[in-house]
């Protein structure tokens, strides 16, 4: 997936923004890292002249592999300028360029990720209510409505792309990432694959879509808010995509037992597989369930919040375990994978581009479609810079190739089992997860409950192995590599 081309582009001295270079360090004091994306890193910064705090997204030019990538950066800046002044969209300040990078300075959102708002609404052991779920989804849909009105299609709508303006309880929800966004005319059709797995619309998978795809993604976010997980989480990813295109959307199971019928009606309207029949953003905001006073203030089942945390943290646990496995592979074990990497990396740059991956897989006898290769690229490109380096390649290819080996899974298990007693306790899991900045006490407890099938309060090796081999967002497209 993703939004960028990967054709090689030789670095030139010409500017991307077509204006003089500026030393960003002379204008701002760059501080702590706030996050990383496909092109680069976002950091907190302070303007030297005013003392005001902003966020600075730094895009390394070496990560821009094609003219299309350069145009994508310029388009992101144009879109942010174009949308400036919208209440639920981060405010653009200025863009700078130096010899190595492009820097986009924007409003700093100090309240953290949108998920924190959900946690803040759930206090004293109670879950949030449908009315409070409306408070969360309304600004998201409002962003979609305003963007569509302004001729912009978002293409990668997901909770991670929204932050809170401050830590105040009445903080504003702000859309922060427009790297995948494009300008769009009414009725215009796009064909380029873009988006994120759980939230992607069926017509995007079919390669013919318009702005209605954003409504589907917003509908998935609402679905998660109401029942704690996306409607489609099947692995491998290819199977999940098949279900997105055709499987029944469940709003009748036990998870939905106490959800208002109006909420279910809205979800079904937003997740209509026919884009022409799908409800518009303006219609979503005018829906009876969304209007002030219509949604129930009765707390949603508390298990929903637990599921949300689990959904967020479980894959992170597996990623930590996968890193351990990859780091412990011997030179002999990865020799063949290194050779394969070298064969695919035809320009010997040390990274594999999308074009090289397509060509290499064809030579290996794969008949994957363009969309499937793009999905594979997205799955393997862990740091999101548009190419696959040797470590990412080994992690990706060894996933199918190594998880069947108990010794590799056991190495990961031992990383968590600090006292080597054959069990991972809550304390050991908490220690390891916090070491990697993942999870809190509640979600860690939930993970143990999920994985601990014999209910002894600990995770033994068999339970850990089952978890690692069960469906997760880490497995899918990596299994498409024709490696036996």
Swiss-Prot record:
Alphabetized GO MF terms: ATP binding; calcium ion binding; protein serine kinase activity; protein serine/threonine kinase activity
GO CC aspect terms: membrane
Q: Where is the active site?
A: 156
Q: Which EC number(s) does the record attach to this protein?
A: 2.7.11.1
Which sequence positions carry the modification called Phosphoserine?
Answer: 196
- What is the enzyme's main class? transferase
Lipid tethering residues (N-myristoyl glycine) = 2
One annotated GO biological process: response to calcium ion
Annotated binding of Ca(2+) 4, by residue: 452, 454, 456, 458, 463
Annotated spans, Autoinhibitory domain = 295-325
Membrane topology for this entry?
A: Lipid-anchor
* Protein kinase domain span: 28-290
Q: Where in the cell is it found?
A: Membrane
Where Ca(2+) 1 is bound, by residue? 345, 347, 349, 351, 356
The reaction(s) catalysed by this protein are:
L-seryl-[protein] + ATP = O-phospho-L-seryl-[protein] + ADP + H(+); L-threonyl-[protein] + ATP = O-phospho-L-threonyl-[protein] + ADP + H(+)
According to the entry, every stretch annotated as the EF-hand domain falls at 332-367, 368-403, 404-439, 444-474
Pfam families per record: EF-hand_7 (PF13499), Pkinase (PF00069)
What positions does the entry give for Ca(2+) 3 binding? 417, 419, 421, 423, 428
Give the comment on domains. There are 3 contiguous domains conserved in the CDPK subfamily: a kinase domain, an autoinhibitory (junction) domain and a calmodulin-like domain. The autoinhibitory domain (295-325) inactivates kinase activity under calcium-free conditions.
Q: What is this protein called?
A: Calcium-dependent protein kinase 31
**Organism of provenance:** Arabidopsis thaliana
Lineage, uppermost ranks = Eukaryota, Viridiplantae, Streptophyta, Embryophyta, Tracheophyta
Q: Which gene encodes it?
A: CPK31
């Amino acid at each position: 997936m993703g939004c960028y081309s990967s054709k090689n582009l030789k670095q030139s001295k010409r500017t991307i923004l077509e204006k003089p270079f500026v030393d960003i360090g002379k204008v701002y004091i760059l501080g702590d890292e706030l996050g990383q994306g496909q092109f680069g890193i976002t950091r907190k910064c302070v303007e030297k002249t005013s003392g005001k705090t902003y966020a600075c997204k730094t895009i390394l030019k070496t990560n821009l592999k094609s003219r299309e990538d350069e145009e994508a950066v310029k388009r992101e800046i144009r879109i942010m300028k174009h949308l400036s002044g919208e209440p639920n969209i981060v405010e653009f300040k200025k863009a700078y360029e130096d010899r190595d990078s492009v820097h986009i300075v924007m409003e700093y959102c100090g309240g953290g990720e949108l998920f924190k708002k959900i946690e803040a609404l759930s206090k004293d052991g109670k879950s949030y209510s449908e009315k409070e779920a409306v408070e969360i989804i309304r600004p998201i849909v409002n962003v979609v409505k305003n963007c569509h009105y302004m001729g912009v299609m978002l293409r990668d709508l997901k909770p991670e792309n929204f932050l809170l303006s401050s830590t105040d309880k009445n903080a504003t929800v702000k859309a922060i990432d427009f790297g995948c966004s494009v300008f769009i005319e009414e009725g215009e059709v796009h064909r380029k694959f873009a988006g994120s797995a759980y939230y992607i619309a069926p017509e995007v998978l079919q390669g013919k879509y318009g702005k209605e795809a954003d409504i589907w993604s917003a509908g998935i976010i609402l679905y998660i808010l109401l029942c704690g997980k996306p409607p489609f989480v099947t692995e491998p990813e290819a199977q999940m995509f098949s279900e997105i295109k055709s499987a029944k959307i469940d709003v009748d199971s036990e998870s939905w037992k106490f959800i208002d019928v109006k909420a279910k009606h809205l979800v079904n309207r937003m997740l209509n597989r026919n884009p022409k029949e799908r409800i518009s953003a303006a219609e979503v905001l005018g829906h009876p369930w969304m209007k002030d006073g219509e949604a129930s203030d009765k707390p949603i089942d508390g298990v929903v919040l637990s599921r949300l945390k689990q959904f967020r943290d479980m894959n992170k646990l597996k990623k930590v375990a996968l890193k351990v496995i990859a780091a412990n592979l011997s030179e002999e074990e990865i020799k063949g994978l290194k050779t394969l990497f070298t064969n695919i990396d035809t320009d010997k740059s040390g990274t594999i581009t999308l074009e090289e991956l397509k060509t290499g897989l064809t030579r290996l006898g794969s008949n994957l479609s363009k969309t499937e290769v793009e999905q594979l690229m997205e799955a393997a490109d862990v740091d999101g810079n548009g190419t696959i380096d040797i470590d990412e390649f080994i992690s990706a290819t060894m996933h199918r190739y190594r998880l069947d080996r108990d010794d590799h899974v056991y190495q990961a298990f031992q990383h968590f089992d600090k006292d080597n007693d054959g069990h991972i306790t809550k304390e050991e899991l908490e220690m390891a997860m916090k070491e990697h900045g993942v999870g809190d006490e509640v979600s860690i407890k939930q993970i143990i409950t999920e994985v601990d099938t014999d209910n002894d309060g600990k995770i033994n090796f068999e339970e850990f192995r089952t978890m690692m081999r069960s469906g997760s967002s880490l497995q899918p497209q990596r299994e498409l590599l024709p490696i036996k």
